[in-house]
A protein has these predicted regions:
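Sequence signature of WD/YWTD-type beta-propeller architectures
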Residues: 1-153
Length: 153
């Protein structure tokens, strides 16, 4: 019909005194991954920020303990297959958000051990002073900035 149904709240973070940001449904529609923090929308600045997973058909919510660390986990993006995701984390030094990748099993809802995006120079992250706040996965090479949106979707 091209129309939306009645809105439905699937999780009330405010009941736990928390805030949700970056909710993203998995490509198969089975899961909703989101960032949970104590307050606000700029979770990258909150060390307590963690990734959570809601199972859509049961409403069960759990912390993604297999990827969360003692520091910030924030913005995340599913791969087009739903078998991988990337997220920003400050787990290395508490200062700079770095892109970590993890596999995901849609049958079990479990993530694999996260790993940092490899670089040619093993010391790259020791001297790189920029942050990966919003990592995105793309499906094709980006030849120029005007084509970025096509590569993401």
């Amino acid at each position: 019909s091209g129309k939306f149904g009645t809105p439905e709240c699937v999780y009330r973070a405010s009941e736990q005194g928390k805030s949700v940001s970056f909710p993203r449904v998995s490509p198969d529609g089975k899961y909703l991954m989101f960032t949970l923090s104590d307050y606000g929308n700029f979770s990258i600045w909150h060390p307590e920020s963690e990734l959570c997973l809601l199972t859509m058909d049961t409403g069960e919510i759990r912390f993604l303990n297999e990827v969360n660390s003692n520091d910030v986990e924030s913005f995340h993006t599913w791969s087009s297959s739903g078998r991988w995701f990337v997220f920003s984390s400050k787990r290395l030094d508490g200062l700079w958000a770095r892109p970590f990748f993890a596999s995901f099993d849609p049958e079990t809802g479990k993530a694999g051990k996260p790993f940092l995006m490899p670089q040619k120079d093993p010391d790259f992250y020791d001297t790189f002073t920029k942050t990966y706040n919003l990592p995105e996965l793309i499906k094709q090479p980006v030849r120029n900035g005007n084509e970025m949106i096509k590569a993401i979707h």
